[in-house]
């Protein structure tokens, strides 16, 4: 999945597949997670957030199932 870099102290890059509602998040520690069932509005909110890390923790981290892919 193609990801775009973001300016964040915790998150390195973010990608989204609208056909499968899958959000992919790469952290600065090198780990990559895919979150399932994420609506496009949540992805857009994450990308546009003033603080990507805060938005991620408040709206995504504990709301969607995930797997570590790297």
Residues covered by each model-derived region:
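Acidic/histidine-enriched, beta-strand-rich ligand/metal-binding domains
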Residues: 1-70
């Amino acid at each position: 999945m193609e990801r775009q870099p973001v300016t964040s102290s915790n998150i390195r890059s973010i990608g989204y597949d609208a056909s499968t509602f899958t959000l992919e998040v790469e952290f600065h520690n090198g780990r990559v997670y895919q979150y399932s069932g994420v609506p496009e509005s949540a992805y857009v909110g994450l990308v546009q957030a003033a603080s990507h890390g805060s938005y991620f923790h408040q709206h995504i981290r504990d709301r969607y199932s995930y797997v570590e892919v790297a």
